[in-house]
Design a protein with these regions (language model features):
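Alpha/beta-hydrolase-fold enzymes
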Residues: 2-87
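The feature captures the conserved acid-bearing segment of alpha/beta-hydrolase catalytic domains
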Residues: 15, 110-124
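Acidic beta-to-alpha connecting loop that harbors the catalytic carboxylate
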Residues: 132-135, 160-162
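Short beta-strand/loop motif that positions the catalytic acidic residue
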Residues: 123, 129-131
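Catalytic active-site module of serine/aspartate enzymes centered on a nucleophile-bearing elbow/loop
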Residues: 159-184
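Hydrophobic, aromatic-rich cap/lid helix
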Residues: 90-112
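Conserved loop-alpha-helix segment in the C-terminal half of the alpha/beta-hydrolase fold
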Residues: 133-154
C-alpha cells in the first residue's frame, strides 16, 4: 500500500506497480480478513499503549512479527508459505524482520489510526496491481483497486500464484506485462 500512498501524494509519479500489495493499516487495525471488531481494536490500543509506558520505563523495547520457527503443525497455509520463503535460503536475510524477530511491537500502533490508502481514489497516473489468485492477501489488492478511478488502472490476478510466489518465482512473475506497462 505504500506505493499507492506515494502515488496519491506525489503527482510527479508517472506510473505505479504493486505486487502482492498489503494494506498495512487495514491488517493492523482490522486483523487478517477483517476479523477484529471495534472492541478488539480498543483492547489492542489499551494493550499497546500500556506496553509503550512499560517499555519507556524499562528502556527495553520488544519485537514481534517475525515468521514463527519452528512452524507449528496447525499453522495456516499462508504462514507455511511465509516460512518456506523467509526461513529458508530462498528468502532468508539476517536483517529481514520477517526472517528474524520482527519489528518493534509498537510499530503496529501507528497504522491502527492512520489509514495509508485514504486518497488512492485521487491517483491520476497509471496503476498496475498484481496479485496471486491463491494469495491470502488478494483481497487487499481487489478492494484497493475498486477505489481507483480512471481507465489507466489495471488489476492483474495471476492464476495459481500465492503471495510469496510473486516475490521470486520467475515462472509466474509477469515481467513482460510489467515492462509493457511502464513503456506505455
Amino acid at each position: 500500500g505504500f506505493a499507492l500512498n506515494a502515488a496519491a501524494n506525489d503527482p510527479r509519479i508517472k506510473a505505479t506497480v504493486t505486487s502482492t500489495m498489503y494494506d498495512m493499516s487495514r491488517v493492523n487495525a482490522n486483523g487478517y480478513f477483517d476479523s477484529m471488531s471495534a472492541d478488539d481494536r480498543y483492547d489492542l490500543r489499551v494493550r499497546l499503549n500500556e506496553r509503550r509506558t512499560e517499555e519507556y520505563r524499562s528502556g527495553e523495547y520488544g519485537r514481534d512479527g517475525g515468521v514463527v520457527d519452528p512452524l507449528p503443525d496447525d499453522a495456516p497455509l499462508f504462514v507455511r508459505q511465509y516460512h518456506d520463503y523467509y526461513k529458508t535460503q530462498r528468502g532468508y536475510h539476517r536483517r529481514s524482520p520477517n526472517s528474524n524477530d520482527g519489528l518493534n511491537v509498537l510499530n503496529s500502533l501507528a497504522f491502527v489510526n492512520m489509514p495509508i490508502l485514504s486518497y488512492i481514489g485521487e491517483i491520476r497516473s497509471a496503476v498496475l496491481m498484481i496479485h496471486g489468485a491463491e494469495a491470502h492477501s488478494r483481497y487487499f489488492s481487489e478492494d484497493a483497486f475498486k477505489r481507483l478511478t480512471g481507465d489507466n488502472k489495471e488489476l492483474l490476478i495471476i492464476p495459481g500464484a500465492c503471495h510469496v510466489d510473486l516475490y521470486d518465482n520467475l515462472d509466474v512473475i509477469p515481467f513482460d506485462r510489467i515492462e509493457s506497462f511502464f513503456r506505455k
